[in-house]
Amino acid sequence: FLMTYGDGLSNINLNKLLQTHNQKKKLATVTAVPPIPRFGAVRVSNNLVNKFNEKPKENKNLINGGFFILETKLFKKINLKKNVMWEQEPMIKLTKKKQLAAYIHKGFWYPMDTERDQNYLNELLKKNAPWLKK
């Protein structure tokens, strides 16, 4: 089944997400996305800044994009406790058991965690909402 946090907008191709999940044959697949360049990057050595990059566009790290495909049998396999945060104990257990695959999405993804995010996404909606493009 599909699961999402519901606090992000994206043009994720759900068919490709499902295809990756089926190919990897794991209990869960997470959508991995590049982080948005919201903050500047600071490289520090011996308490001295040796590089500063304001809102870098390139970041080789990926973050949890909040869109998942889960097998129903995973609830029996990883013994989940009640009232646990999905991105903590369950995802850590799945990772340790090598049962968490990743679908890498390089298209549009943006969180809506703050009023600032909401305002930005509303402006995009008025112009040309990239999450509505095929």
Per-region residue spans from a language model:
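Short beta-strand-to-loop element that shapes/binds the nucleotide-sugar donor at the catalytic cleft/hinge
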Residues: 28-44
